[in-house]
Regions:
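Short secondary-structure transition hinges
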Residues: 89, 93-126, 155, 159
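Basic, helix-initiating cap at the start of DNA-binding domains
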Residues: 1-23, 32, 53-56
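HTH DNA-binding helix-turn interface
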Residues: 22-25, 38, 45-55
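Amphipathic alpha-helical linker/stalk segments
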Residues: 56, 60-83, 123-127
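Append "Primarily bacterial transcriptional regulators
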Residues: 28-35, 44
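Short hydrophobic clusters on alpha-helical segments that form packing/core surfaces
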Residues: 12-20, 28, 62, 66, ...
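Amphipathic alpha-helical packing segments from all-alpha helical-bundle domains
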Residues: 107-134, 140-144, 171-174
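Amphipathic C-terminal alpha-helical segment
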Residues: 100, 146-165
Length: 174
């Protein structure tokens, strides 16, 4: 009797995440996930009632991944500039995920809910030397302005309309 293979939720999530990371949500289906894993669609539907439940799990994983990519970038020592550069770099290195979450809006949220008003971003900025004496409202306004500029650049980079050149992008963001 052949050994049965166990397809876990972790395997399904990781495989689905990699599909979305490479090609976006448009190609995500139980059949494509199963093909990638090398199984039938049955294990996928054993773990998830429907594709919407699976998509919600992928969104959680992807947003945490994208936020980590963006927030871990440090080049200039200026927190706001580094956040902007990290955001544009994320669009360059992860274009399918960037488009899905920040251009196609697969999560149906306002972008201001994700980035400028993010408590994590405000906290990071408040802890930086250059923002110690700035009110929370002024800080949120500065973040929003920088983010709008960075988002425009990142969108152009993600769709291939602007070549990713970090030095030029840094000059624009300054």
């Amino acid at each position: 009797m052949p050994k049965s293979t166990t397809i876990t939720q972790e395997i399904i999530i990781e495989t689905a995440f990699e599909i979305v990371r490479k090609e976006g949500f448009a190609v995500l289906s139980a059949r494509n996930i199963a093909k990638q894993i090398g199984c039938s669609t049955q294990p996928i539907y054993w773990c998830y009632k429907n594709m919407e439940d699976l998509k919600a799990e992928i969104c959680k994983k992807a947003l945490a991944f994208l936020q980590n990519v963006m927030l871990s970038y440090s080049k200039t020592g200026n927190t706001l500039l580094d956040l902007g550069l990290g955001y544009v770099r994320m669009a360059h290195t992860e274009p399918a995920l960037f488009k899905a979450f920040y251009m196609d809006n697969v999560t149906n949220v306002k972008l201001t809910d994700i980035f400028p008003e993010s408590e994590r971003v405000v906290e990071i900025m408040k802890n930086s030397e250059e923002c110690q004496n700035i009110s929370d409202q002024e800080l949120k306004n500065d973040i929003a302005k920088g983010w709008m500029l960075a988002h425009g650049i990142a969108s152009l980079v993600a769709v291939g309309m602007l070549v990713y050149d970090e030095d030029k992008i840094l000059e624009i963001l300054k």
